[in-house]
């Protein structure tokens, strides 16, 4: 039986577990909240911090595959797990790109994925300089 871990136990984690119920998969979830939506559907629940290197590494080292249900996870620990043979989805390199919204938008532009125009600002004065860039959505990079 495949041992599959999910980092994060929110609604997406719960939906992943519901789909996994149709397959020969032993499920593991790590989340800081023991009452999260996914906690009671998995075979094994671990209370832990998905942003903490040691928690993520220790959670994943005995598993066959690890995935995420939220992007705010420790990608360094995921990279170490992948280096040691655990299958990680999405790949830690991809996660590093999608975690930072500036990197994500620049990557989309580079590979010509249709995406809205954007301006990167790093200060209040730069934000004022681009006040005519409307409509706009303002996001923190990471």
Where are these regions (language model features)?
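Active-site nucleotide/adenylate-binding loops and adjacent lid/helix of ATP-dependent enzymes
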Residues: 95-142
């Amino acid at each position: 039986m495949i041992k599959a871990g999910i980092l994060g136990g929110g609604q997406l984690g719960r939906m992943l577990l519901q789909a996994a119920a149709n397959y020969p998969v032993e499920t593991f979830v790590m989340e800081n909240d023991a009452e999260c939506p996914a906690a009671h559907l998995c075979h094994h629940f671990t209370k832990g911090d998905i942003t903490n290197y040691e928690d993520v590494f220790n959670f994943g080292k005995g598993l066959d595959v690890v995935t995420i249900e939220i992007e705010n996870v420790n990608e360094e620990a995921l990279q170490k797990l992948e280096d040691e043979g655990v299958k990680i989805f999405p790949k830690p390199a991809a996660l590093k790109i999608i975690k930072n919204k500036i990197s994500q938008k620049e990557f989309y532009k580079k590979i010509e994925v249709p995406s809205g125009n954007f301006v990167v600002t790093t200060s209040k004065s730069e934000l004022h300089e681009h006040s005519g860039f409307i409509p706009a959505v303002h996001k923190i990079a990471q």
